[in-house]
Amino acid sequence: MSSPPREHSPMMRQYLDVKERYPDYLLLFRVGDFYETFFDDAKEVSSALNIVLTRRSNGSSSEVPMAGFPHHASEGYIARLVKKGYKVAVCDQVEDPSEAKGIVRREITDIVTPGITYSDKILDDRHNNYLCALALLKEGRRVVAGAAFIDVTTAEFKIAELLPEEVADFVRSLHPAELLIARKEKERFEPVRKEFPPDMVVTELDDWMFGEDQASAVLARQFKTHSLKGFGIHGNSAGKVAAGVILQYLEETRQNRLHYITRIGTLQNTDYMTLDLQTRRNLEIISSMQDGTINGSLLQVIDRTANPMGARLIRRWLQSPLKRLEDIALRLDAVEEFKDFSPLRREVHGHLSEINDLERVLSRIATFRSIPREMRQFGSALSKIPLLKEALLQTTTARLQALGRSLVEMPELVALIEKAVDPEAGASMRDGGYIRAGYHQELDELRTIASTAKDRLLEIQQEERARTSISSLKVQFNKVFGYYIEISKSNLDKVPDYYEKKQTLVNAERFTIPALKEYEAKILNAEEKSIVLEQRLFHDLSLLIAEQAALVQTNAAVIAEIDCLASFAAVAEEYGYCKPEVAGHDRLLVTGGRHPVLERMMSTDDPYVSNDLLFDRKQRLLIITGPNMAGKSSYLRQAGLIVLLAQAGSFVPAQKAEIGLVDRIFTRVGASDNLASGESTFLVEMNEAASILNNATSKSLLLLDEIGRGTSTSDGMSIAWSMSEFIHDSIGARTLFATHYHELAELETRLQGVVNYNATVIETAEKVIFLRKIVRGASDNSYGIEVARMAGMPQEVIVRAKEILAGMEKREIDVSGIKQPSIESMQISLFEEADSRLRTAIENLDLDRLTPLDALIELKKLQDLALKGCGR
């Protein structure tokens, strides 16, 4: 921080002492009715908020930069700073300046960071706001990564154990607002930081916070236990360290009211399907690739939730499909009952819509950030639980019955809030009046004193009017001068001598008298005591609610799940989805399948064309050829989304669906340059393809679109062919392989389980009509020129392209008078006899030991050898 070298003023010394303890935070320093920032902080705040940068006198030293804003508008300004990635420390005056002996005492009263905020101006109620920590531990010769994450506004707290190479994808999947790492691990994480979400703030912490013993002690203290076995996290050392780091960071940032965080769990890969970044992006599960918003995503179609808790959970469900058949069946049965009995579903939906965000309101109550109106709504929401419970206990399916039984009625708490908080309570606590009459005897007495005294003031007003003959005389009040008698200047000659002047105005003067002073003291004293007492009573009520946090959180979790199941059912009924049969076999049958998002975008004049899909022992790898724009990519995405929905527990857009359980969905669809990190389209494509080949199993679903198009025709086709063989021979995964390399159709005759399909078209004399129907057999034409025409390419370009194509089909073409070899002669022939050196090299390959990467390297060597033999 830049600061003048000479003597600072007492207040500035106080500021610098606090700033020294919080160097990484923008320090908001309360001065009167403003929060001020100084020095470099002021420059940052001025720039970030577009407010005036001014200067303040600093004792005998020169003036210092200063920028600030009114304290009553601080929440909005702080929200803007945090959204820009800043961390903010709030330093308040903690004593009355009029009673201060010397400099006013100030303390840090709040710290707000991207990962630690309770403000509605920052949070989206349909999104979680995660704070995540990463820890690395050595276990023998290997390094294990542990992750933990928490949403302080909902008390969701989880840990996970990862391989180091899984860290980047985990962080991108979670997309936390803030990530905590050890300073010593900064360099280790540097290579993958470019893969982290760009809007995520990375906070480096002292290394000592990442000790195992330290973490265990912090966790035991938080959960008031000697062992963490009951939470199922006992053996996850790295994850426990990360969780301990989060709790220490919360304590360090003065989040010392954490008793509402009552549980911690672990993410188990055995229970949930892992979806990597490419799959989430390519399937457009949460956001569309077009603009990154929810518009055009699966979530937009599926989310019919009635409250924020359900909205947050349905996001997690879609991003973490289930892998346990029993869990999937329980959800599907519950959805079926909700779908078949729509009156029940509508009744439940009505109750859900009247329940506010219990999780986030609870966190604000427990941290004393709530307002009276919100607490009243909290009590009203809890009062709906008996009605919801009664409705669910009328159901017949196991899961809905269990959810109904899990709901905990809280009549005592509801009655307490009803008795304590006034129905007309607003957002402000400054002037009191939000604690209900009859709740507390002392408060009622103080209010009676104030009210009686105010009645006496009216009597004084009438008496003084009669005594002075001034009919316009008024007894009034303001916060600066208290109670006073106001008399217009035209009546000043009638003012008695015992009137004591308090203030002179342009058209009037204000006075007081002994009787007015007496009752003013009674009123102000009673009102001041009332406000203090109301604040204490509201604080005590908040503590009582926080003590029942575990029960409230149980109810919140149940309500969120009910909301998601009802949402699935509403969508299934409206859009004609069917109940999928999910089993442990490898068969995958979809009859009349539809893309859930695209079908909603189609007009009634151009309805979505449904397609069938079959994987069984005879069909494991489907090669799909056909023209661009004919629906190949949509067909691939449709298959992935149907499987994802089925294993999330939703009905699916099809006439019939049998889903053999899938452990992971992999996609390689489309391509985009990652130029910021120096990666080309083809390198990105190969990285993604390599990840698929190294991680897929026979239980996986592979959706591959146009593999190899980022390089030359010969290289691309060689890679596509080789990958197909490797998937067939070594993995055995159910695979949809869309390609423009029509030569791959040859694989059907060579490999058992490889079957050709194509996207059909109708050719007329004038144009080509894309039917978007996937049928058996290979295609022999890509119709690229027709696609170019539809895109609006100039007519002369289209005509010339047809001439060139005709020449190619005759095996030679004349371009500017130069004879060109046929297209076949420019592509590598996989069946042509090579010279002796090429033959020898091929014969010496040990195919049983080749990895996918080795195969690509050897292919490159063979290509170089072949080109050298051709004199090129």
From Swiss-Prot:
The UniProt record lists the keyword Mitochondrion: no
Annotated InterPro entries: DNA_mismatch_repair_MutS (IPR005748), DNA_mismatch_repair_MutS-lik_N (IPR007695), DNA_mismatch_repair_MutS/MSH (IPR017261), DNA_mismatch_repair_MutS_C (IPR000432), DNA_mismatch_repair_MutS_clamp (IPR007861), DNA_mismatch_repair_MutS_core (IPR007696), DNA_mismatch_repair_MutS_N (IPR016151), DNA_mismatch_repair_MutS_sf (IPR036187)
Ligand binding (ATP): G626, P627, N628, M629, A630, G631, K632, S633
Domain of life: Bacteria
CC annotations in GO: cytosol
One Pfam family, short name: MutS_III
Keywords, alphabetical: ATP-binding, DNA damage, DNA repair, DNA-binding, Nucleotide-binding
A GO molecular-function annotation: mismatched DNA binding
Gene Ontology biological-process entries: mismatch repair
SMART domains: MUTSac, MUTSd
Residue ranges of the TM segments: none
Keyword Iron tagged: no
Cited function: This protein is involved in the repair of mismatches in DNA. It is possible that it carries out the mismatch recognition step. This protein has a weak ATPase activity.
Family note: Belongs to the DNA mismatch repair MutS family.
Protein name as it appears in the record: DNA mismatch repair protein MutS
Source species: Chlorobium phaeobacteroides (strain DSM 266 / SMG 266 / 2430)
